Regions:
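Membrane-embedded transmembrane alpha-helical bundles that form the catalytic cores
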Residues: 1-244
């Protein structure tokens, strides 16, 4: 998972590592504290740190743009853009790690004793880019089961994995949705939306409906690819449109 992330995001892998460490130890601190007020403060610190980092990379330049537009009208000096590169999967691994910490805070989950186990959960590569977001109480038991068997047994389980055929089939449907539906609809929709004044109302309505189909096929396709890849590895992750 970390190799995949480093290959696509290079040094921004530091953010994934920070999010993992941040949530792992703050969840432990929440679990170890019996003081309700302290637990709440730790959770707030976690939320501010995690969401603040996400907001910085996703919305900093948007905020600067709005400020500069206002500054231009009132005669204030504009501030330079940060031009931050958006790390791949930052929304998904941020919310996935937060869901773990919040579940610990609510008493629904006992914090993981193993940092490697938690890191694997946060960075599980099939769904790192486009989800679906995993819940720790669904995923960690599967991981622990596989960690408690020998390497030989694990290899045999993967070879004779009854979900292998199903996983490949789901991935194939995902690629079909993405490549044959979403990618072929996109140019047509973009052409209409780029110059809507040149088209009649009926065409614009059809393009709007087609855009909805494009978004569904694109997102659903990525999700199916993730679910299928996870099944091939022996993990079951939730259907995103049933458990968003």
């Amino acid at each position: 998972s970390y190799f995949f992330f480093y290959f696509t995001s290079n040094y921004l892998i530091i953010l994934l590592l920070f999010t993992t460490i941040w949530n792992f130890y703050l969840a432990k601190a929440i679990s170890n504290s019996k003081n309700k007020v302290k637990r709440k403060y730790i959770l707030i610190i976690n939320l501010v740190g995690s969401l603040g980092l996400l907001g910085l990379f996703k919305y900093a330049d948007f905020g600067i743009e709005q400020f500069n537009n206002l500054a231009h009208h009132v005669g204030l000096s504009e501030i330079p853009y940060l031009n931050l590169i958006l790390p791949i999967g930052i929304s998904f691994y941020t919310f996935q790690a937060l869901s773990y910490t919040i579940d610990v805070y609510r008493g629904k989950l006992t914090p993981s004793k193993s940092f490697m186990e938690f890191a694997f959960f946060v960075a599980f590569f099939p769904q790192l880019v486009a989800g679906p977001i995993l819940r720790a109480n669904d995923f960690l038991p599967q991981l622990r089961e596989k960690m408690n068997i020998s390497a030989t047994s694990l290899r045999q389980a993967l070879i004779h994995n009854s979900n292998l055929k199903l996983g490949v089939t789901i991935m194939a449907f995902g690629f079909m949705k993405k490549m044959f539906i979403a990618d072929n609809i996109a140019p047509l929709v973009n052409e209409v939306f780029k110059f809507p004044i040149g088209y009649d109302s009926f065409t614009i309505i059809i393009a709007t409906i087609a855009f909805g189909i494009q978004i569904y096929a694109d997102f659903s396709g990525y999700t199916d690819i993730a679910i299928g890849a996870a099944l091939i590895l022996g993990f079951k992750i939730p259907a995103n449109f049933n458990k968003p």
